[in-house]
From Swiss-Prot:
Presence of the UniProt keyword Disulfide bond in the record: no
Function: Major toxin that belongs to the bicyclic heptapeptides called phallotoxins. Although structurally related to amatoxins, phallotoxins have a different mode of action, which is the stabilization of F-actin. Phallotoxins are poisonous when administered parenterally, but not orally because of poor absorption.
InterPro entries associated with the record: Amanitin/phalloidin
NCBIfam families associated with the record: amanitin
Cross-link entry 2'-cysteinyl-6'-hydroxytryptophan sulfoxide (Trp-Cys), positions: 3-7
Protein name: Phallacidin proprotein
Top-level taxon of the source organism: Eukaryota
């Protein structure tokens, strides 16, 4: 979500979770 990406810290954490889900 855009509101999550707005925060670098949260965005980075979300990216990790998304990367895990993708694999």
């Amino acid at each position: 979500p855009a509101w999550l990406v707005d925060c670098p810290c949260v965005g980075d954490d979300v990216n990790r979770l998304l990367a895990r889900g993708e694999k």
